[in-house]
Amino acid sequence: MKIEVNNELISRLQNLALVELNDREKERIKRDIKNILDFFDQINKLDLSNVEPLFHPISTGKLRKDEIIKPLSRDEALSNVKRKEDGFIVGPATYGE
């Protein structure tokens, strides 16, 4: 399935993400999304019929150590949120779409 990366898609993503983008940012996002989708198209064209599936993509087992860090307070977490109400993020309505 080929996804058309156009201004309509960028506007939809902008609304879903609750961000405002200027024209320059929209063009950059459009270019970046197109590059990402083109990369996935290249991956989809690879012949992987003789490749054994991996159980886990990191086969070395070298993962970073878990470290306990101080979590953000509610005020810190909501400091950059465009729409909030009673300490919660208000997102776009998705029911009925």
Swiss-Prot record:
Gene name tied to this protein: gatC
GO molecular function, one term: ATP binding
InterPro entries in the record: Asp/Glu-ADT_sf_sub_c, GatC
Domain of life: Archaea
Enzyme class: ligase
Mitochondrion is among the record's keywords: no
EC number(s) per entry: 6.3.5.-
Keyword Protein biosynthesis: yes
Catalytic activity from the UniProt record: L-glutamyl-tRNA(Gln) + L-glutamine + ATP + H2O = L-glutaminyl-tRNA(Gln) + L-glutamate + ADP + phosphate + H(+); L-aspartyl-tRNA(Asn) + L-glutamine + ATP + H2O = L-asparaginyl-tRNA(Asn) + L-glutamate + ADP + phosphate + 2 H(+)
Biological processes, Gene Ontology terms: glutaminyl-tRNAGln biosynthesis via transamidation; regulation of translational fidelity; translation
Subunit structure: Heterotrimer of A, B and C subunits.
Swiss-Prot/TrEMBL keywords: ATP-binding, Ligase, Nucleotide-binding, Protein biosynthesis
Cysteines paired by S-S bonds: none
Protein name, UniProt field: Glutamyl-tRNA(Gln) amidotransferase subunit C
Free-text function comment from the UniProt entry: Allows the formation of correctly charged Asn-tRNA(Asn) or Gln-tRNA(Gln) through the transamidation of misacylated Asp-tRNA(Asn) or Glu-tRNA(Gln) in organisms which lack either or both of asparaginyl-tRNA or glutaminyl-tRNA synthetases. The reaction takes place in the presence of glutamine and ATP through an activated phospho-Asp-tRNA(Asn) or phospho-Glu-tRNA(Gln).
HAMAP family assigned to the protein according to its UniProt record, in alphabetical order: GatC
Gene3D superfamilies with a match to the protein in the record: Glu-tRNAGln amidotransferase C subunit, N-terminal domain
NCBIfam families, alphabetized: gatC, PRK00034.3-4
Family membership noted in the UniProt record: Belongs to the GatC family.
